[in-house]
């Protein structure tokens, strides 16, 4: 069938029919073809796929030795704002092409993992690109404030790709610690939360020992962050920024332990840990955040227990929590949302 005939046949199809066609066609595509041609990106963002496909076809597959100096140079140029501000290094017409350069790098690096050494190096280079995109969410490096969206890849997706590479060869303790560090040491994109990164990490923590190891490493990072926070003196704006960053890190690590405990079906242990370590400015906020997560985990009995505990402690509770408690009392079920 020619493309013109195909377009004609599908032009008036119902959306349900198109979904069926796409899913069945996707099932028939070999995994290698999906990866090489970034077919998942076509599904996620059809609008930008034409530019990506053009970039992928523009030059042959490069080796890791060829990629490394190009990536190092690109990262340095980007940090110098050569892809944003007027300069004599990157021509004006080439500056908007940075997104296609990054797409190509990410694509090529995933195809250069034939040996453990190559995998480790590819992961390291991907980490540099990840860190750059994270930095570009807070500082002007490109003509966008949402670099992950511009590149056409979700932050948690790129994070997951890196974690997958890290775990191929590194000992569990090493790659788990690296994965946690990668999440807490870099900024979040506009559409990202630490929660989405932790859920991506949990996909790789597919055994109980790995989840327990993640708890151990998260608690180690947490102790370090709390020790640093105690040393911050509140005498300058820089100190305020540092305090805020450390508090965010503590909040994120506390959340990771909670999710790992929940994944181990240790709901009460996770909830108690969260209450003890969450750095929110008030107990009202901490209890709300905990009860929200217990609701998502469908833990009705624990939800009621901690709601009643908050009342006994004299903690003000939000109207949404009061209504949720009423719903449980009347129906015996948790509400769908708060």
Q: Language-model features: where?
A:
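Basic helix-extension-helix modules of the SAP/HeH family
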Residues: 1-38
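Eukaryote-biased, non-catalytic alpha-solenoid scaffold regions
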Residues: 34-338
